[in-house]
């Protein structure tokens, strides 16, 4: 975790991990408290969604029958006093994605302004893990 000692980075990372929590994903109010009013996302599916569409999609998911989403390789950089960029990987029941998030500080705290997910497959044994 890069820059993990900084309060802005810690707040963004903590909030990102909250978004992966099944309880938070089921609650309109909790999701709303973490998403910027102008939030945009390019999801793993390739669809572009705004704040309302993300809240509707996440709260409609049945997360009780599946494993929790796991995050790994999270790194963070504070780009400006009010902007933090996170990158990490997730495993959502075998669906892998590289993720990138921009968190903005507002009067309401650190809110997710932009998010993008890109699907990937885990390299097999003997396959190169380097990307050029």
Give the predicted meaning of each segment.
Residues 2-33, 40-132:
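A beta-strand edge to alpha-helix "cap/lid" segment located at domain peripheries
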């Amino acid at each position: 975790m890069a820059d993990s000692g900084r309060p802005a980075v810690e707040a963004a990372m903590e909030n990102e991990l909250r978004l992966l929590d099944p309880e938070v994903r089921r609650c309109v109010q909790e999701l709303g408290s973490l998403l910027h009013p102008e939030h945009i996302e390019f999801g793993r599916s390739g669809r572009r969604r705004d704040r309302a569409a993300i809240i509707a999609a996440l709260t409609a998911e049945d997360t009780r029958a599946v494993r929790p989403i796991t995050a790994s390789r999270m790194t963070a950089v504070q780009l400006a006093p009010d902007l933090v960029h996170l990158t990490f990987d997730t495993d959502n029941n075998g669906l892998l994605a590289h993720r990138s998030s921009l968190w903005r500080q507002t009067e309401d705290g650190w809110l997710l302004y932009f998010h993008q997910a890109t699907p990937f497959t885990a390299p097999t044994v003997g396959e190169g893990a380097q990307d050029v």
